[in-house]
Each structure stands twice: as structure tokens, then as C-alpha cells.
Amino acid sequence: MRIVINGFGRIGRLVLRQILKRNSPIEVVAINDLVAGDLLTYLFKYDSTHGSFAPQATFSDGCLVMGERKVHFLAEKDVQKLPWKDLDVDVVVESTGLFVNRDDVAKHLDSGAKRVLITAPAKGDVPTFVMGVNHQQFDPADVIISNASCTTNCLAPLAKVLLDNFGIEEGLMTTVHAATATQSVVDGPSRKDWRGGRGAFQNIIPASTGAAKAVGLCLPELKGKLTGMAFRVPVADVSVVDLTVKLSSATTYEAICEAVKHAANTSMKNIMYYTEEAVVSSDFIGCEYSSVFDAQAGVALNDRFFKLVAWYDNEIGYATRIVDLLEYVQENSK
């Protein structure tokens, strides 16, 4: 599979890192970003959160060079001018965060790409896939797909375990979310909402999120049953989902733990992880699981009403699932 990465920010860089780390058969042929290639090479090599990577990487003749591997840098703002046909691109990993509307993303197809994977919640009629939850519903005819958000990738596997074992009447989710590149280091104006412009490392900032509602895109039985909000907090990486849920059938917290533990060792293996350790957020920096269920943190009010907690590295965990989905698409498009 020949892919290009459109947008070499946090997620774009970590997708490339994970492809190289696992020696994936995926071939990255180009990166399109308006930032200078030598600076992007530097940012790829040195990461303040996840440490240095590919120390032998250099910038030469407009390429990111790693031994025998060369990835061409492009800096084209107009999607319709990108040379995807000439490069024989199978999939565009759309990770700018700017193109999430189906009509906008379709311009990659007009430029010659065979498929587009949006690394964000999509707008419009775009199939959404979460590994371990509904990825097997992928149809090769789907030429524009979404991997949802990092938070949906954490919440949806947990919701599926609950749905399959106990049923879900309704639920509210809060994600206590690490700071992201859209936030300001110091107070300033925000286009999205006033509070979002306040200093990221001085404040706990309430924010909106569609992550809980998006679970209904991959688990239709839960459409209209989940919603939620976010608190942006002053940490660089790792977030946590707090799910307050009313189940359809009576059970115990211990039974929920057993159901999650079983799923983590079987159907959700490599997607979910179960822990009874006294963990904190920094313990999960670099964690490749989508959802780490914290058995010590949850509580029960009665036999149908529970608060459940799951951790996730909102960067590495999500980037890993993108690579998983790419490889799944490759295997199931032949």
C-alpha cells in the first residue's frame, strides 16, 4: 500500500513513527505540509513527549531520508493540485485537521488518490470505523472513511463490552483531556469558544466534544444514548474517560470488571487493557492500547448505575489504531 500523509503535525508524525516502528508493509511516499521540510524532519526526530526517534534521519533534496527509505516533502495548499495520480497513491492519510467534510476530502480523489482516511471525526455521510468495534464492517467500496477521534477510540470498545454483556440504557461521558496544539500557552482569543483561548498550562478548561455521540456511528444501538463533555487539563499527553452509565440489566461492579478483563484477553486483545494497579496518567505515555480499563477507579451506585474509568494515550494510542486500520484496509481491499 502506497500512502501519503497530508498534514505532518502531532498525529501525522506519530503515524509515520508507528509505521516504521512495526516495520509495516505500508510505504509512505510523500508528506504534504506547508512547513519547511528541514523543520519537519527535526520535529519528527525529536519529540518532547515521546522521545527521539530515527536519529539517522536527515533532510536532503526535498526528502526525509532514513537509510534507503526516502519520503518526499510537498508544500501544496490546493488539494486539487497535489500529484496523487503521478505518485500512484492508494490512501491519503488526511491529518491536517482542516479537511473533515466529505466534499472537501473528495478533492484528494479528484487528484488521483484511490482512498482517503480522515484522522478525525468526519462531517457528512462518511463511514466511521473504530478498531475492535466495527472495523469488520469496512467495505472496499468505501473510498472515504474516518477513524473517529482518540476519545471515541477509547470509549467505544468499553461501550461495546457493556452493550454486549449488560445492555446500555443511557450514559454521560467526561474526558479529562491532555492539552493539544489548538490551545494557547498563554491567554489569547479563540475562534471556537472564549474559554478555549485561556492558557493551557494554567487552567482546567471545560470544552465540548462529540466523542460520545460518535460512538453511535460505529455502534448504532447506542445512537442518542450517549453524550458528553471534556475538560482540557495541564498535561502534555494521556487522557482519561469517565463514563457514567445506566445499564439495562442488573449486575455488579465485579462482573463488569470480569467482562472487560475477558474482552481484553480475547476479542479486544491489543485494543483494550485491564489493570488493577494504582496507576496515574504518566504511566500511559507511549501506551499503544486504545482503552486501559482502571478497575481500581470505578464505582457503583446500585446494580444498574456505574462510573467507569479508562485511560488512553491520545497521541500514540490513536496513531497506532490508524496504522491498524490502514493495514486492515490493505488486507481487505484485494
From Swiss-Prot:
<comment type="subunit">
    <text>Homotetramer.</text>
</comment>
<feature type="binding site">
    <location>
        <position position="33"/>
    </location>
    <ligand>
        <name>NAD(+)</name>
    </ligand>
</feature>
<dbReference type="InterPro" id="IPR036291">
    <property type="entry name" value="NAD(P)-bd_dom_sf"/>
</dbReference>
<comment type="function">
    <text>Catalyzes the oxidative phosphorylation of glyceraldehyde 3-phosphate (G3P) to 1,3-bisphosphoglycerate (BPG) using the cofactor NAD. The first reaction step involves the formation of a hemiacetal intermediate between G3P and a cysteine residue, and this hemiacetal intermediate is then oxidized to a thioester, with concomitant reduction of NAD to NADH. The reduced NADH is then exchanged with the second NAD, and the thioester is attacked by a nucleophilic inorganic phosphate to produce BPG.</text>
</comment>
<feature type="binding site">
    <location>
        <begin position="10"/>
        <end position="11"/>
    </location>
    <ligand>
        <name>NAD(+)</name>
    </ligand>
</feature>
<dbReference type="GO" id="GO:0006006">
    <property type="term" value="P:glucose metabolic process"/>
</dbReference>
<dbReference type="Pfam" id="PF02800">
    <property type="entry name" value="Gp_dh_C"/>
</dbReference>
<feature type="site" description="Activates thiol group during catalysis">
    <location>
        <position position="177"/>
    </location>
</feature>
<feature type="binding site">
    <location>
        <begin position="149"/>
        <end position="151"/>
    </location>
    <ligand>
        <name>D-glyceraldehyde 3-phosphate</name>
    </ligand>
</feature>
<feature type="active site" description="Nucleophile">
    <location>
        <position position="150"/>
    </location>
</feature>
<dbReference type="InterPro" id="IPR020830">
    <property type="entry name" value="GlycerAld_3-P_DH_AS"/>
</dbReference>
<protein>
    <recommendedName>
        <fullName>Glyceraldehyde-3-phosphate dehydrogenase</fullName>
        <ecNumber>1.2.1.12</ecNumber>
    </recommendedName>
</protein>
<keyword id="KW-0324">Glycolysis</keyword>
<keyword id="KW-0560">Oxidoreductase</keyword>
<dbReference type="GO" id="GO:0005737">
    <property type="term" value="C:cytoplasm"/>
</dbReference>
<keyword id="KW-0963">Cytoplasm</keyword>
<dbReference type="GO" id="GO:0004365">
    <property type="term" value="F:glyceraldehyde-3-phosphate dehydrogenase (NAD+) (phosphorylating) activity"/>
</dbReference>
<feature type="binding site">
    <location>
        <begin position="209"/>
        <end position="210"/>
    </location>
    <ligand>
        <name>D-glyceraldehyde 3-phosphate</name>
    </ligand>
</feature>
<keyword id="KW-0547">Nucleotide-binding</keyword>
<feature type="binding site">
    <location>
        <position position="232"/>
    </location>
    <ligand>
        <name>D-glyceraldehyde 3-phosphate</name>
    </ligand>
</feature>
<comment type="similarity">
    <text>Belongs to the glyceraldehyde-3-phosphate dehydrogenase family.</text>
</comment>
<dbReference type="Pfam" id="PF00044">
    <property type="entry name" value="Gp_dh_N"/>
</dbReference>
<feature type="binding site">
    <location>
        <position position="314"/>
    </location>
    <ligand>
        <name>NAD(+)</name>
    </ligand>
</feature>
<dbReference type="InterPro" id="IPR020828">
    <property type="entry name" value="GlycerAld_3-P_DH_NAD(P)-bd"/>
</dbReference>
<comment type="pathway">
    <text>Carbohydrate degradation; glycolysis; pyruvate from D-glyceraldehyde 3-phosphate: step 1/5.</text>
</comment>
<dbReference type="InterPro" id="IPR006424">
    <property type="entry name" value="Glyceraldehyde-3-P_DH_1"/>
</dbReference>
<feature type="binding site">
    <location>
        <position position="77"/>
    </location>
    <ligand>
        <name>NAD(+)</name>
    </ligand>
</feature>
<dbReference type="GO" id="GO:0051287">
    <property type="term" value="F:NAD binding"/>
</dbReference>
<feature type="binding site">
    <location>
        <position position="180"/>
    </location>
    <ligand>
        <name>D-glyceraldehyde 3-phosphate</name>
    </ligand>
</feature>
<dbReference type="InterPro" id="IPR020829">
    <property type="entry name" value="GlycerAld_3-P_DH_cat"/>
</dbReference>
<dbReference type="GO" id="GO:0006096">
    <property type="term" value="P:glycolytic process"/>
</dbReference>
<keyword id="KW-0520">NAD</keyword>
<feature type="binding site">
    <location>
        <position position="119"/>
    </location>
    <ligand>
        <name>NAD(+)</name>
    </ligand>
</feature>
<dbReference type="InterPro" id="IPR020831">
    <property type="entry name" value="GlycerAld/Erythrose_P_DH"/>
</dbReference>
<dbReference type="GO" id="GO:0050661">
    <property type="term" value="F:NADP binding"/>
</dbReference>
